[in-house]
Amino acid sequence: NLIQFGNMIQCANKGSRPTRHYMDYGCYCGWGGSGTPVDELDRCCKVHDDCYGEAEKKGCYPKLTLYSWDCTGNVPICSPKAECKDFVCACDAEAAKCFAKATYNDANWNIDTKTRCK
């Protein structure tokens, strides 16, 4: 679920920005998403959005699905349980790891999505 996803982001990005800084970033980080991602971090969010879309096609509710996971050495690791839980956990874990590798550009936070996300 979204709270667990936030915790995974903190796991993979120890000592970095608060999770809320990722909620209104670029064209895809946060609610909705459209256009071309503005950078690598925004591409991570688009891939995550697409993964949630695939989960929904499988009949899962990714924003609400609770799953089991651990943070080991700044790496989120999913604990296998059931199909939806595993799929959603993998979406979140991969996105959190992607965030850890991507550069955060302050200029892409809280952008005008109407003009920049076409």
UniProtKB/Swiss-Prot annotation:
GO MF annotation terms: calcium ion binding; calcium-dependent phospholipase A2 activity; phospholipid binding
InterPro entries: PLipase_A2, PLipase_A2_Asp_AS, PLipase_A2_dom, PLipase_A2_dom_sf, PLipase_A2_His_AS
Major enzyme class: hydrolase
GO CC annotation, single: extracellular region
Predominant subcellular localization, coarse grouping: secreted
Binding site for Ca(2+): Y28, G30, G32, D49
UniProt tissue specificity: Expressed by the venom gland.
Function: PLA2 catalyzes the calcium-dependent hydrolysis of the 2-acyl groups in 3-sn-phosphoglycerides.
PROSITE patterns per record: PA2_ASP, PA2_HIS
Record's cofactor remark: Binds 1 Ca(2+) ion.
Lineage: Eukaryota, Metazoa, Chordata, Craniata, Vertebrata
Family assignment from sequence similarity: Belongs to the phospholipase A2 family. Group I subfamily. D49 sub-subfamily.
Catalysis performed (reactions): a 1,2-diacyl-sn-glycero-3-phosphocholine + H2O = a 1-acyl-sn-glycero-3-phosphocholine + a fatty acid + H(+)
Cross-referenced CDD domains: PLA2c (cd00125)
Name of this chain's protein: Acidic phospholipase A2 PA-3
Disulfide bonds: C11-C71, C27-C117, C29-C45, C44-C98, C51-C91, C60-C84, C78-C89
Keywords annotated in UniProt: Calcium, Disulfide bond, Hydrolase, Lipid degradation, Lipid metabolism, Metal-binding, Secreted
Pfam families xref list: Phospholip_A2_1
Locations listed in the record: Secreted
EC number: 3.1.1.4
Active site per database record: H48, D92
GO biological process terms held by the UniProt record: arachidonate secretion; lipid catabolic process; phospholipid metabolic process
Annotated SUPFAM superfamilies: Phospholipase A2, PLA2
Cofactor(s), by name: Ca(2+)
